[in-house]
């Protein structure tokens, strides 16, 4: 088995997140149009935006994969051919269908696009993976429930031309590869059509039928009981083993998460993957960057066996808040920034950016674009000037630590 450097595939829920993923080192991004995708609550890309997004990515040498992974009903299936032709004409590199009918339509109506079988298909063995290849798939996104040993077994038994993609980072679903009806039953929002309300994150208690109104927690905790709560996956410390398993693509979950998340997690995995592949010991500072985004407690998922559940707390950990984003910066460090959250002259903050090792900075007095002094910019999205200690790339972040809650 040839050892291949995996593609780093990163989330792009909208144009801002796309720019961040591209700038911070993605080899490819995955996104959705306004139809047939599994993230209804992200902005996604309109027919006018999609060609612009593809051009932005392709100009940077980044591929674009588009999800077509809902389970379509009859009326939607009838609308699929025109949509697939639109994606093909726009220059999408690969489509990610979950439904067999959609997969076959993609081969007919989007002949220039590769077909990557979605994780919603729960591909969990070599026979299934090979069958999809025989039908025309160039890649399968394996079920998240597989161990490293099982993935290696698939790699050894399928055609070497078939690419294998696995998730390496992000939220995990308590159901099998996302096949869940809790949201449908409890809220009327279809989890298999991009509308999951995440009822697995709700607080639950037990009630005995002869004692109505008396609620008994499954686990004693003043915050509630989280009987279906899953940790987030983080495999950044195990990328060498993922490479050894013959995985062709490492996927970061999170199209519905923030642009900051897309940037920081992409950058962290880019640096560590490059170091691992080159035989270098990864710099710890990049591994620690995944702790600087909002997340639940981390685990290695199913890669090393059954992960169990995290039953203490369902809340996200948020240790860092974004103050501003750098729009441009000259060689002397004179920068134009866009405000995200309040901060003031004299604050100690961190600066992190594309290919930029994080560093601390004490904020000097600032000014607006007309040169009027600012001690504390206050208006969200306002543009202002500040003197940084050195030149930093556009799309760098100014951030500061915040007090933890929920740990």
Residue spans for each PLM region:
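Surface-exposed amphipathic alpha-helical tracts and adjacent flexible/coil segments at the periphery
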Residues: 1-23, 28-31, 35, 54, ...
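Glycine-rich, positively charged N-terminal anion/phosphate-binding segment
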Residues: 39-58
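Short beta-strand elements of ligand-binding domains
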Residues: 66-67, 97, 117-119
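Gly/Gly-Pro- and Ser/Thr-rich, intrinsically disordered tail segments characteristic of DNA damage-repair
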Residues: 78, 113-124
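Alpha-helix capping/helix-boundary segments
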Residues: 101-102
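Conserved phosphotransfer cores of two-component systems
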Residues: 110
């Amino acid at each position: 088995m040839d050892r291949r450097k995996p593609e780093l595939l990163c989330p792009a829920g909208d144009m801002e997140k796309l720019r961040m993923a591209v700038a911070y080192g993605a080899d490819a991004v995955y996104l959705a149009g306004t139809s047939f995708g599994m993230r209804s609550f992200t902005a996604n890309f309109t027919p006018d935006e999609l060609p612009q997004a593809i051009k932005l990515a392709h100009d940077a040498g980044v591929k674009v994969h588009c999800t077509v992974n809902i389970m379509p009903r009859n009326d939607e299936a009838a609308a699929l051919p025109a949509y697939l032709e639109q994606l093909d004409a726009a220059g999408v590199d690969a489509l990610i269908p979950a439904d067999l009918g959609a997969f076959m339509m993609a081969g007919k109506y989007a002949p220039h696009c590769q077909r990557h079988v979605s994780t919603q298909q729960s591909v969990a063995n070599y026979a299934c993976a090979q069958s999809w290849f025989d039908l025309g798939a160039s890649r399968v996104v394996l079920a998240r429930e597989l161990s490293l040993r099982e993935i290696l077994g698939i790699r050894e038994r399928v055609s070497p031309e078939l690419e294998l993609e696995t998730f390496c980072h992000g939220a995990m679903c308590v159901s099998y590869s996302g096949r869940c009806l809790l949201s449908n039953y409890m809220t009327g929002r279809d989890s298999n059509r991009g509308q999951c309300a995440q009822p697995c994150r709700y607080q639950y208690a037990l009630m005995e039928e002869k004692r109505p109104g008396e609620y008994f927690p499954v686990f004693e905790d003043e915050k509630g009981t989280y009987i279906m709560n899953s940790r987030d996956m983080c495999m950044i410390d195990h990328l060498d083993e993922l490479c050894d398993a013959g995985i062709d693509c490492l996927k970061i979950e999170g199209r519905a998460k923030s642009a900051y998340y897309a940037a920081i997690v992409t950058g962290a995995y880019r640096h560590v993957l490059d170091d691992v592949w080159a035989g270098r010991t990864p710099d710890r500072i990049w591994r620690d960057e995944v702790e600087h985004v909002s997340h639940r407690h981390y685990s290695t998922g199913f890669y090393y066996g059954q992960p169990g559940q995290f039953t203490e707390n369902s809340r996200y950990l948020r240790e860092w808040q974004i103050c501003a984003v750098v729009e441009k910066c000259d060689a002397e460090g004179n920068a134009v920034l866009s405000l995200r959250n309040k901060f003031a002259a004299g604050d100690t903050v961190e600066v992190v950016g594309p290919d930029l090792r994080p560093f601390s900075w004490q904020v000097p007095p600032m000014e607006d674009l007309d040169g009027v002094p600012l001690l504390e910019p206050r208006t969200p999205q306002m543009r202002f000037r500040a003197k940084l200690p050195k030149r930093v790339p556009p799309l760098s972040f100014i951030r500061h630590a915040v007090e933890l809650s929920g740990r």
